[in-house]
Structure formats: structure tokens, C-alpha cells
Curated annotation (Swiss-Prot):
The protein is methylated on either Ala-2 or Lys-3. NCBIfam families: rpmD_bact. It holds the Pfam family Ribosomal_L30. HAMAP family: Ribosomal_uL30_B (MF_01371_B). Part of the 50S ribosomal subunit. Belongs to the universal ribosomal protein uL30 family. One of its GO terms (molecular function) is structural constituent of ribosome. This is Large ribosomal subunit protein uL30. One of its GO terms (cellular component) is cytosolic large ribosomal subunit. One of its GO terms (biological process) is translation. PANTHER family: LARGE RIBOSOMAL SUBUNIT PROTEIN UL30M, MITOCHONDRIAL RIBOSOMAL PROTEIN L30. Keywords: Methylation, Ribonucleoprotein, Ribosomal protein.
Length: 64
């Protein structure tokens, strides 16, 4: 049986208005599009890098 992947919950706390288009695309890649939305994603180095790129717009709610 496969081991369950670690998951991370990310909440959008900032608006992408007047931000660089790459930051908007990163939010879309994180499955976020409105303030207050929460997305549950696999905890991978790629996702951590995306969170780091928009750390002023998101916060980590929960790590499992």
C-alpha cells in the first residue's frame, strides 16, 4: 500500500491586484483566486517554492 502524501493547507490573505502577472499565475497554480479561499495541496518542494514566491499573499494554515 502506498504511503499517504503529506498535505498542506494554504489560505489566500492578500489580493493579486497590482501585482506582477507571475504572482497572479502562481496563485492560480496554488488553486487560489479570492481572499479567504483555502486550498489543500501536497507538501512538495515545488509547492513550497510557490508559497515562498507569494508569501506576502498567502499563509500556511495547517501542515499534516
Amino acid at each position: 500500500m502506498a504511503k499517504a502524501a503529506n498535505m498542506i493547507k494554504v489560505e489566500q490573505i492578500g489580493s493579486p491586484i497590482r501585482r506582477h502577472h507571475s504572482q497572479r499565475e502562481t496563485l492560480i497554480g496554488l488553486k487560489l483566486n479570492k481572499i479567504g479561499r483555502v486550498a489543500e495541496l501536497q507538501d512538495t518542494p515545488e509547492v513550497r517554492g510557490m508559497i515562498g514566491k507569494v508569501q506576502h499573499l498567502v499563509r500556511v494554515v495547517d501542515e499534516k
